[in-house]
Swiss-Prot record:
Protein's name in the database: Kallikrein-like enzyme LV-Ka
Subunit details: Monomer.
Active site: S140 (charge relay system)
Additional detail: Negative results: has no fibrin(ogeno)lytic activity, no coagulant effect, and no plasmin-like activity. Does not inhibit platelet aggregation. Has no proteolytic effect on dimethylcasein and insulin B chain.
Entry keyword set: Disulfide bond, Glycoprotein, Hydrolase, Hypotensive agent, Protease, Secreted, Serine protease, Toxin
Temperature dependence: Optimum temperature is 30-40 degrees Celsius.
Post-translational modification: N-glycosylated.
pH dependence: Optimum pH is 7-9.
Activity regulation details: Completely inhibited by the serine protease inhibitors NPGB and PMSF, partially inhibited by benzamidines, and weakly or not inhibited by SBTI and EDTA.
């Protein structure tokens, strides 16, 4: 997260750092005591041959995020967090996750920066119009939290991160809630929405 600060230790209890054999890979979000969302592995299994639900070791320090009961409202102040780089043009990974407040933007504001982006992509745009606060490389899979609910999953955005007029793009969790609940319940045959 660029333009943010170190997260308070109690506010990132659902945020995880995912490592592979070569080191840090990306952020992820805990959505129940056993299921971890990693952006490419959980929300888009149709695009991958290997649908992974990663095992989580329970502890009193882990608190999953609530799935949304309704979509977020444009203008909402939302919280982003992640283990990604904290500098926009070079990779500077922090020792603790960083957080920032950004605003949920109208689709029209998003279309200015991203002509190919539309409602059919089941996404949300959030950021600060003047730039300076944004998720960045390594934050993918982390949460966009609005009113205490897990509304978005960090997906993609501009390079360099935090560029004015180019907000971050997030997978809209509300559109996948029924499918996520089916997967959590053990229904591996559930079909991911297009």
């Amino acid at each position: 997260v660029v333009g943010g600060d170190e997260c308070n230790i109690n506010e990132h209890r659902s945020l995880v750092a995912i490592f592979v054999s070569t080191g840090f890979f990306c952020s992820g979000t805990l959505i129940n005591q056993e299921v971890l969302n990693q952006e490419d592995k959980f929300i888009c299994p149709n695009x991958k041959k290997n649908n992974e639900v990663l095992d989580v070791t329970n502890s009193e320090n882990i608190v999953p995020l609530s799935l949304p009961s309704s979509p977020p409202s444009v203008g909402s102040v939302c919280r982003i967090m992640g283990w990604g780089t904290i500098t926009p043009e070079k990779k500077t990974y922090p020792n603790v996750p960083h957080c920032a407040n950004i605003n949920l933007l109208d689709d029209a504001e998003c279309h200015v920066g991203y002509e190919r982006q539309g409602k059919e992509y089941r996404t949300l745009c959030a950021g600060v119009v003047q730039g300076g606060k944004d998720t960045c490389q390594g934050d993918s899979g982390g949460p966009l939290i609005c009113n205490g609910q897990f509304q978005g999953i960090v997906s993609w955005g501009p390079h360099p991160c935090g560029h004015p007029g180019e907000p971050g793009v997030y997978t809209k969790v509300f559109d996948y809630t029924e499918w996520i609940q089916s997967i959590i319940a053990g229904n591996t045959a559930a079909t991911c929405p297009p």
